[in-house]
Amino acid sequence: MENVLRVVILGFIQGIAEFLPISSSGHLLLLKKFMHIDLPIVFDIYLHLATVLVVMIYYCRRILELVAVLVKFVLGKTTECDFAKLRLILLILIITIITAFIGIFIEMFKGLFTLNLVLINFIVTSILLFLLESRIVIFDLKRNILLAGCLIGTMQGIGAMPGISRSGITIFASVLLGFSRSESFEISFLSLIPIVFGSLLLKYKELFESDMLFSIFEINLGAIIAFLVGLFSISLFVKMLQDSKLYYFSVYLIILVSLVYFLF
């Protein structure tokens, strides 16, 4: 029964924090420290598959459009009206490549992330969200796909650090480069799909070496909860982004850091 409660909490946190700009990795690290458990790799994989499934459902039509354009490109049948979608595909490809290099580098040092460093990263995320809702300088660089992809990919790679919100930092970078909020949201979450599947491939070997702390039922339960909560969270994030209310998350992170620092 204790394990059931744990997977419910972990699934809920993953579903909330993966989509809202508050860092799922940072929150899960806090939970692991305070619950005194190490997440088995298979459970981590299931949680991420659940959340990426949310993105694929939310952007189902958009993904099908991009796949169709890609097929037309391979067959040499693209038209002028397909160029915008091809640019988006190229942008996501560049972002994915840059993110992968930086993410692999950060993964090598993930065991060195202390609680204090995670709290500092929470503060950094809070500042970025505050700046996103402020009158920050906008650079009109979105037409330069290579430069934009490299910069956004770099930010998304940094987002692999626990406490740094991947969605928050990529949306911040995209808006800074001149993309609209809706475009930035789309870029952030469409680029999540190849990154998650790529990271799962890298963890494939570990899957057979990890201990089964949770039962199959408990693992599936956690994934289902992460999926259902994620469906709600992604819609909530869209609304709050459109309404310019991301400062709520900025305040939340400062409160969280204060509570953890002074109480623990």
From Swiss-Prot:
NCBIfam families: PRK00281.3-3 (NF001396), undec_PP_bacA (TIGR00753). The chain crosses the membrane at residues 7-27, 39-59, 89-109, 112-132, 145-165, 182-202, 212-232, 244-264. It comes from the Bacteria. The keyword Ubl conjugation does not apply. This is Undecaprenyl-diphosphatase. The keyword Membrane applies. The gene is uppP. It catalyses: di-trans,octa-cis-undecaprenyl diphosphate + H2O = di-trans,octa-cis-undecaprenyl phosphate + phosphate + H(+). It comes from Borrelia hermsii (strain HS1 / DAH). Catalyzes the dephosphorylation of undecaprenyl diphosphate (UPP). Confers resistance to bacitracin.
